[in-house]
Design a protein with these regions (language model features):
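Short, flexible active-site loop motifs that bind/organize anionic cofactors or intermediates
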Residues: 11, 23-26, 143
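Long, charge-dense low-complexity segments
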Residues: 10, 14-20
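Positively charged, Gly/Ser-enriched RNA/tRNA-binding surfaces
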Residues: 6, 14, 35-183
Length: 183
């Protein structure tokens, strides 16, 4: 689970030049603790704290709750904690991880977002979250959605035995076709 607006809320409060904002956002995307050091100014400790609050849900949420976040970021963190709590309550054996700085592919999202993985399967099964609806260039209400990646899903389900088939070109004699089918 992630909250793409969390870091954005912190960075927007820093009044950084565009190139510094981009460099800092890149350092966060790479989880580059050292790269954050020279760019974050007064938000360095909070941003490093967010990096430390990445991982298995319960310890990550505990670390996240200890951070002194700006108001907008607190709202995003609160939503993340609420959704994670609901997921963990509904499926206590589910492996849930938290990444409060993740936003790659979620830049347009407005709330808690998620990526689905399954152990032993290469790639994401899907991802989704909340995003603004836009009609004819005007923004409207939020929507929620999920994209499932069929290639990954097919790798995740057990394969059945392939059905035996034969190719019978037009004009194949019925006796030959019957013999092939008998094999």
């Amino acid at each position: 689970l992630c909250a793409p607006t969390l870091v954005t809320a912190i960075l927007n409060g820093l009044d950084l030049p565009a190139e510094s904002y981009t460099a800092l956002r890149g350092a966060l995307d790479r989880k580059d603790d050292a790269g954050i050091a020279g760019l974050a100014g007064g938000a360095e400790q909070v941003l490093k704290g967010l990096l430390a609050a990445t991982g298995t849900a319960r310890p990550a949420l505990a670390a996240l709750s200890q951070l002194d976040l700006p108001e907008d970021a607190r709202a995003a963190a609160s939503a993340l904690r609420e959704v994670a709590g609901l997921v963990l309550a509904a499926a206590p054996d589910l492996s849930v991880t938290i990444d409060p700085v993740e936003r790659r592919g979620f830049e347009y999202q407005t709330g808690v977002s998620f990526t689905l993985f399954v152990q032993g399967v290469r790639g994401e099964l899907g991802r989704g979250g909340r995003y603004p609806l836009a009609a004819n260039g005007a923004s409207g209400e939020d929507a929620a959605g999920c994209t499932l990646y069929m290639d990954s899903l097919l790798r995740a389900v057990p394969g059945g035995e392939a059905e035996k088939r034969i190719f019978l070109p037009y004009g194949t004699a019925p006796a030959v076709a019957a013999e092939l089918r008998a094999d």
